[in-house]
Amino acid sequence: MTVTACKNNCLPFTTKLRKRLENTTYTHIRRNVTGYGVGMHCIDIDLIVNTPEKRKEFREEIMDSPVFCFHGVEVPVINERVGRNHIRGIHIRPEYPVFSTKAPHATFILSNHSGGDLTCGEHYYLTFEDEKGTWRELPINAAFWDIAYVLRDGEERVMKASLYPDVHPNKPGRYRYFYEITIRRKPVLMMAEFRLTDNEEEWRTAEKTSLPPLYFGCREGREPTIDNGRANGRTGL
């Protein structure tokens, strides 16, 4: 099939597919889809988790066609990279040390007591430790708005990371949140480690984390203010 023929034949399918996804009650299947469109020879469908089971589920519950080509991760890729949880008066931490395995998201706090500004964006990624002790990337929707924020000295920024428990079951264990910031035009990869648990009492009774004494109120006895993101008008870092 030529590219032109593919476009002519596939466009009606994309319209039908869009309506099926919008109207489905299987929200977990819809959330597994990060994008779709007419490619060179087929309709490309991008999935967070691209296993045979997920493809079968999509074809049975949403729509099936021989022109569908699925893309995405089938086995989480190995990523044993590490970052910093503090540097020059800048600190990152999870809001709680532990979250439920069924939690839709985890929250993190970036504190700036560096004496100057830093910039940050929306992009993040997560890793988890598997049963063999290997760190792998947690499948998520990696599409983010390309926007930059300025975090002033003495301010904090609260970020949410989606965990997608409805797309893939998250197991109890250790996880890492990675978030890049820019200090004086130099990128720095920050990292905060946290846990997921299926013990309801453990995550319900978990206390909020606090800024280490070294950082708390370190400038003129002033406590940090909360800033959920002040856009600086730039389109990227």
Describe every region a protein language model picked out.
Residues 140-184:
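Short, solvent-exposed, Trp/other aromatic-anchored flexible loops in extracytoplasmic proteins
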Residues 78-145, 150, 180-206, 214, ...:
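Primarily secretory-pathway and cell-envelope proteins
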Residues 2-23, 68-77:
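N-terminal targeting leaders
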Residues 60-76, 129-130:
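Surface-exposed edge beta-strands and adjoining flexible/disordered loops or tails in beta-rich
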Residues 41-43, 88, 102-104, 155-157, ...:
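Residues at beta-strand starts and edge strands
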Residues 1-13, 27-58:
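Short glycine/threonine-rich beta-strand-turn micro-motifs
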